[in-house]
Amino acid sequence: MARLFGTDGVRGVANQDLTAELALDLSVAAAHVLGEAGAFGHRQPTALVARDPRASGEFLEAAVCAGLASAGVDVLRVGVIPTPAAAYLVNEYRTDLGVMLSASHNPMPDNGIKFFSRGGVKLPDDLEDAIEQRMGEPWARPIGDKVGRIRYTPQAVDTYVDHLVRSLRQQDTLKGMKIVLDTANGASFHTATAAFTTQGAEVIAIHDQPDGLNINERCGSTHPEKLQAKVVEVGADMGLAFDGDADRCLAVDHEGNIVDGDHIIAILALALQEDHRLASNTVVATIMSNLGLIIAMRAHDIHVDQTKVGDRYVLESMNANGFSLGGEQSGHVIMSEFATTGDGVLTGLHLAARVARTGKTLKELASVMTRLPQALINVRGVDKLRAGIDPDVNKAVADANQKLGDAGRVVLRPSGTEPVVRVMVEAGTQEEADQICSELAETVKMSLAL
């Protein structure tokens, strides 16, 4: 049986895969497992419960709150807020547990349940496994005054926005800037506008009217086309696109060009380096980050620590080594001085502040990194477990890397969930990248066929 918890909590189609019954059972099991693990001490435990605007979040929130309270946990409902806001507030309010209901950038019918432990950090795999294994057990239920209470905490949004604003250390940092924000009809529809406006920016918000059904619908960081057009139309200095739960951010310069996560990391790395706040002069990226990022950072004596794909692996490296900046090309950017997870609004604020403080355009700042042409082919129906040991494949990869030299690279990455091997090639020209990628994909297909 497949593991219920994925790399980012439990996800599925709401009311089909992710039912109210499952949400309640998960919450009861989480309360008891964490209690047995000593997470609560000897006092009445507390949990923070948040959600994005999806319609299904309403019944899932009710189920989670009921499960926790029935297990003796006092619940703080904070309503619709971004995932990074939930993580921050778990730490700020010193709750023992946090629960975020969101499927991030996924389509509206999906939803998810993500747990945070004390401090606003993701639960370790062993605790997730324990929760999953012990769902449905006949737990002893508290009665009387030991039953948990549920209360709404409306000031949570203001608390989080204050944190965002204070992270810039100065007031009116963005005064004089015109910025377009695409909040994906998601959880940042109120927090993003409030934070940027408070810091002095003129904000033009689009896709900021969530109705429970329109989250991520042809908008946000996965569909930035309307943002690009709007930035040019209104003559804005820049634009920012978030996803449904605002844990990622992509930017658009004044000419409508996309500035992806790799470029954002490069820009912020130089800003932190100037302020002597780039820990160990290192940034963390994944093996799929563009080689141009590594080349750009090397030119400024900044080391790039590369991890497996996934923001959880970026965060693991940052936590283990005390690094202050990391992220992915997709726009998940983690600034550990201010957050325990990727925070799109925080990232966007600091990117805009860099534009304001340097007096340069975002396009000029992004030129610190030249993106190498990239080709990617997903080879399906192959034995992915042999990808790193097949002699024909290994020889083809070695030959390609020798041909590319320092001007490119090859990455073969087996999928974690499908019989697929992803072949990625970066080279000096798009034509060369496409050709080498196609040849390698054919070798993988022939050599690893099932």
Curated annotation (Swiss-Prot):
Phosphoserine PTM sites in chain numbering: S104
Entry's EC annotation: 5.4.2.10
GO BP term, example: UDP-N-acetylglucosamine biosynthetic process
One GO location term (cellular component): cytosol
PROSITE patterns (alphabetical): PGM_PMM
Keywords, alphabetical: Isomerase, Magnesium, Metal-binding, Phosphoprotein
Catalytic activity: alpha-D-glucosamine 1-phosphate = D-glucosamine 6-phosphate
Pfam families named among the record's database cross-references: PGM_PMM_I, PGM_PMM_II, PGM_PMM_III, PGM_PMM_IV
Catalytic site positions: S104 (phosphoserine intermediate)
Post-translational modification: Activated by phosphorylation.
Top-level enzyme category: isomerase
Top-level taxon of the source organism: Bacteria
Cofactor details (free text): Binds 1 Mg(2+) ion per subunit.
InterPro entries listed in its UniProt record: A-D-PHexomutase_a/b/a-I, A-D-PHexomutase_a/b/a-I/II/III, A-D-PHexomutase_a/b/a-II, A-D-PHexomutase_a/b/a-III, A-D-PHexomutase_C, A-D-PHexomutase_C_sf, A-D-PHexomutase_CS, Alpha-D-phosphohexomutase_SF
Cofactor requirement: Mg(2+)
Keyword Coiled coil annotated: no
GO MF assignments: magnesium ion binding; phosphoglucosamine mutase activity; phosphomannomutase activity
Record flagged with keyword Magnesium: yes
Role description: Catalyzes the conversion of glucosamine-6-phosphate to glucosamine-1-phosphate.
Family listed: Belongs to the phosphohexose mutase family.
Protein name: Phosphoglucosamine mutase
Organism: Cutibacterium acnes (strain DSM 16379 / KPA171202)
